[in-house]
């Protein structure tokens, strides 16, 4: 006995004929778009249910590039740096991907960041270090020779991690990096709801989001 249904087939642009063939072969009752792609009109016309991925907090660079202080943030920890004198420089971005992360230079670093003497475990008083925002380096001026130091600092996420993975894995070349945004911020939250509402109106062919 042959039955159909309960199977969703992923598809993407320029894949209409093979999608039709596989849908018939495997008895698919629904088709969804692959991440970062759109379905061809020929696929939409197959008469299957359409599942569509919608990303409420990315893929709108026209908005977030005007509000770059409203991207998500993370705390990062630098590598340990050995002080060879009473001053030591700790580079913030060594080991981090600069296309994905950017130090938050907007908020007061002495309020939100932390420099730690890893040899003693003590937090260095904020008066004992300064940030060079041009070099993304913390200058520790109250160091103890032969002690190791780290910096915990806030950074903006400027490339959505999932989209970055797909971009690099699929070799999307010069496709614009999608910048994520944080709906904690009222203006961005309103933008997210407004654009989703408009997307629903513009996507009557979609059965399941």
Each language-model region and where it sits:
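Acidic/aromatic-lined carbohydrate-recognition and catalytic surfaces
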Residues: 7-191, 202
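Active-site regions of oxyanion-processing enzymes, predominantly non-cytosolic
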Residues: 206-209
């Amino acid at each position: 006995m042959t039955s159909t249904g309960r199977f969703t087939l992923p598809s993407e642009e320029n894949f209409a004929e093979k999608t039709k063939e596989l849908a018939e072969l495997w008895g698919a009752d629904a088709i969804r778009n692959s991440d970062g792609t759109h379905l061809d009109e020929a696929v939409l016309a197959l008469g299957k249910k359409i599942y569509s991925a919608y990303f409420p907090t990315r893929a709108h660079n026209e908005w977030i590039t005007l509000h770059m202080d409203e991207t998500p943030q993370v705390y990062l920890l630098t590598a340990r740096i050995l002080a060879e004198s009473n001053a030591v420089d700790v580079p913030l971005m060594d080991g981090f991907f600069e296309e994905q992360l950017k130090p938050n230079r907007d908020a007061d670093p002495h309020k939100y960041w932390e420099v730690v003497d890893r040899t003693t475990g003590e937090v260095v008083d904020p008066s004992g270090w300064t940030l060079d925002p041009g070099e993304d380096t913390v200058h520790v001026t109250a160091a103890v020779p032969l002690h190791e130091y780290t910096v915990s600092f806030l950074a903006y996420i400027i490339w959505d991690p999932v989209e970055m993975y797909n971009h690099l894995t699929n070799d999307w070349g010069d496709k614009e990096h999608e910048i994520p945004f944080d709906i904690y911020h009222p203006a961005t939250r309103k933008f997210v709801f407004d654009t989703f509402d408009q997307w629903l109106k513009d996507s009557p062919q979609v059965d399941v989001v």
